């Protein structure tokens, strides 16, 4: 089984090294094609206004000056000797759940894989802060992902479906179990932080100010809050099928 790894945190991210260790429990044919720099929040963007630069880091390890989507395309269409059987994207530093999946470069890496007809799974690990230090228990994903991925890789999926897996912010022995979930709903809390440069000109940072949300039972939010691993099937078809008839009647 050939496995392609990517992420959005960059080629040198701790989570990517952790994912490679996980992948090597499944296969000896593991390839890494990841962004040269942090691409968090770039979602499913493509680099079409500037060229991509490719750098070989080591055996089967490549850095692309581009987005996670660029990396998957380069891996599948340029770098690997043949199409991978599985694409794994992650392990992201922080959960990718609810509305945040639309911003996520980690999820987008798996999304591009699904577009290419390849079994694709995004993996993310919740974290917490101790003072100003971000503590990401990657050991939780490393301990639990191998057995879970064996099951997920062996499970048939319809075309156009990818899997979004999130691990709770706790130690492996504190995880209660694994559940299949749906996307939850966060309170939109992005805000604009205006500052001034040395010449007095304004510049801006977009910042998260998350409000605590428990989430309804059955959602990814609720699962992580209750120390459960969340597995959410996502689909490429974004059509809101349930209101098509209603719209047709309104336009008749």
Swiss-Prot record:
GO terms for cellular component: cytoplasm. It catalyses: a ribonucleoside 5'-phosphate + H2O = a ribonucleoside + phosphate. Its EC number is 3.1.3.5. One of its GO terms (molecular function) is nucleotide binding. A divalent metal cation binds at residues 8-9, 40, 92. Its main location: cytoplasm. Its cofactor is a divalent metal cation. The keyword Lipoprotein does not apply. Keywords: Cytoplasm, Hydrolase, Metal-binding, Nucleotide-binding. It is found in: Cytoplasm. Binds 1 divalent metal cation per subunit. Belongs to the SurE nucleotidase family. HAMAP family: SurE. Nucleotidase that shows phosphatase activity on nucleoside 5'-monophosphates. This is 5'-nucleotidase SurE. It comes from Mesorhizobium japonicum (strain LMG 29417 / CECT 9101 / MAFF 303099). The lineage of its organism: Bacteria, Pseudomonadati, Pseudomonadota, Alphaproteobacteria, Hyphomicrobiales. The gene is surE.
């Amino acid at each position: 089984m050939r496995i392609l790894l990517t992420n959005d945190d960059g080629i040198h991210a701790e989570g990517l090294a952790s994912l490679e260790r996980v992948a090597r429990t499944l296969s000896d044919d593991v390839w890494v094609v990841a962004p040269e720099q942090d691409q968090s929040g770039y979602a499913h963007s493509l680099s079409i206004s500037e060229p991509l630069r490719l750098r070989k880091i080591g055996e089967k390890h490549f850095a692309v000056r581009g987005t996670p989507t660029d990396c998957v395309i380069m891996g599948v269409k340029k770098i690997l000797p043949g199409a991978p059987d599985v694409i794994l994207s992650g392990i992201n530093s922080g959960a990718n759940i609810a509305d945040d999946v639309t911003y996520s470069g980690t999820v987008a890496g798996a999304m591009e894989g699904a577009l290419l007809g390849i079994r694709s799974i995004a993996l993310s690990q919740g974290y917490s802060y101790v003072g100003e230090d971000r503590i990401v228990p990657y050991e939780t994903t490393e301990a639990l992902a191998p057995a879970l991925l064996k099951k997920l890789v062996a499970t048939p999926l319809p075309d156009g479906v990818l899997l979004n897996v999130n691990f709770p912010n706790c130690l492996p022995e504190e995880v209660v179990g694994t559940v299949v979930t749906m996307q939850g709903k966060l309170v939109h809390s992005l805000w604009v932080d205006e500052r001034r440069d040395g010449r007095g000109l304004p510049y801006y940072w977009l910042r998260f100010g998350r409000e605590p949300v428990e989430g309804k039972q059955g959602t990814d939010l609720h699962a992580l809050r209750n120390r459960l691993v969340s597995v959410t099937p996502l689909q490429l078809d974004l059509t809101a099928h349930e209101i098509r008839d209603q719209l047709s009647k309104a336009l008749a």
